[in-house]
Amino acid sequence: MTYVVREGDSTTTGGMVLSASGSQTWEDRRLARMGDPVWCERCAQVGFIGQGNPTFIDDLVAVATDGHAVRCACAEGTHRLIASQDQLQADMEAAIDIPKDMADKARKRARQMTRARLESHEPLT
């Protein structure tokens, strides 16, 4: 499906999108994009959105849609996004992988968020 994923939407591992776009919303929830942080319940780490739909762009970043991959400590391809709404869609079903430089920044941010969670001993969910 090409339904757009938003902040707070869940994932196939029981996780959720932690934060998203600062400029675009749908039904008062920010749109998720490549590189945005995602909590993974299975590996207990913060990962990031590793794919986006090139037909829906927000601030020069591809927006994530249902089924796009999350990168975390889980095996590649086992952690996917689940859209919670069925109205806002990208123009077509498509996926591009996050560029290396963007992935490096997202990975660094995810590690910082995981470390902060471990130091605070507070669950993210």
Q: Which role fits each region the language model picked out?
A:
Residues 1-125:
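Intrinsically disordered, low-complexity proline/glycine-rich segments
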